[in-house]
């Protein structure tokens, strides 16, 4: 199981909200078209389709925290010395782009959720609920794999017993 926090989705999220980042990437001009976001969504769908065809299960979670809850968590991080490390002043600056981020999230979820690589939008104001919802989705995905421990044939069992005998005689 691999977990990516944002990953390649940054290119259709932060870069979309802050288009100056796109300009600073120094991409060839022919790649920056009016269709750049749709092209990037298509690239993401194709990449995840490739992963699916190679046996990788891709599930994605958007932890939907309300603006009010985010504010409360920021204040808690400021007030609690053990959580100060979690807070950055840039968090408040980015909060000013809330509506832009919500639009970007809506577009990326709408354009990159597929049957084989779905997005799960998780209400995340309640951390316990969010954790249960995520765990449930992961368990369901694992169950659908119908995984079983490998079995060994009689020849392998005999080989293991012979090795065990050698080890016991040391």
Language-model segments: residues:
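Flexible, compositionally biased loop and terminal segments
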Residues: 1-170
